[in-house]
Amino acid sequence: MKFATVTAVLLMIIVCVLLPKLPAIHTWAVEREEERIAEAELAEQKITMSDLTIKNTEVADDTEQRQLRLKLPAGVKGSDITISNDYVTQTVRIELPQTEVSYFENDPLTGSSNHIDNLSYAVSKGSSGLIEITMDQVYELDMDYDENYYYFDFLTPHEVYDKVVVVDAGHGGRAPGATKQGINEKDIDLGIVLQLKAIFDNSDENIGVYYTRTDDSNPTFDQRVQLANKSQADLFISIHNNSTKSGRMSSTHGTQVMYSESDTKELGSKAFAQICLDHVTEALESRDKG
C-alpha cells in the first residue's frame, strides 16, 4: 500500500515533511502554551525514582552495545515481568513483582550503557519494583528470558522496518485546539489518526509507524519533533483541523497541506505534500487550499 493511498482517504488538514528538517507547524505562542500545559500534566504523574547503576561489560561491536541482561529477583519468573516501551519519551518500563530495595542495590543489570541516557528505579509499598530506562533514541525491543535472567536487545527502527513513519494527532489533553459548537479539534485530529492506524495495522507492508498520541494526552511540542528525529523517520505527518482566527462560522473550507520549503529534493516534502493534497481533495471532494 503506497503512503499516499494510505493517507488519502483520511486526512483533512495535514502537515507532511520528509525528515530531518521539520517546519514550524504552530506559531510560537501556541507551541509554548501547549508545551506548558503538557509539562504540567506530566508533573502531576511524576513518580519518585532513584538512580540505578549498570554493571558495564566490554563490547565487541555496535550491536553488543545495545544489549542488556537483567537478573531476575528471587521467586520471580520471566513471565511475571511486565515491560512497556514508550516511544514518545524513549522510555522502557520494567515492572517486577515481589521486589525489595536490596535487589536494586546489587547491580541486577549487566551490559552496555552507551545507548542509555538515564536509569532509575522505584519500589512501591507493596514491594513491586519498577525500572525506568531512558534511551538515547527510539528502539524496538527483542526480548527473551530463562530461569535466571531476562535479556534485552535494542534494535533501531530501520533494523526492523523498511520505512519509518511518524503520525502526529494535533493538540490533546488540556489543549483542545480549534473549538466550535462544543467540538474540539483535538478529538477530530485523534479520530483521523486512529482510522489511519487501523489501516496501517492491517497493512502487509513492512512499515514502522509511530504515533505521538493515540489517546487524549498532550505530548510536548519537543517530544513530537524528537519522536520523528530519534526514530530517524522517513516521513512525518501531522493532522490538524483549522478554524478562522475569529472562531466564527465561515464559508472558508477545504484541504491544505504544509511542507518544509527548505527541503528542495525532487522527491522531498513538497512532492509528498502535493501527492497528499491531490488524493485527499479528490477523495473528500474538498476545495484545494494549497
Segments (PLM) and residue ranges:
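Short linear recognition/processing motifs and adjacent strand/loop elements at protein termini
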Residues: 1-166, 173-174, 192, 198, ...
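Glycine-rich N-terminal loop/short-helix segment of MobA-like nucleotidyltransferase
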Residues: 171-181
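Active-site-proximal helix/loop segments of hydrolytic enzymes
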Residues: 94, 183, 187-290
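Short hydrophobic segments within beta-strands
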Residues: 168-170, 212
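Generic anion/oxyanion-binding catalytic loop in active/binding sites
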Residues: 77, 178, 217
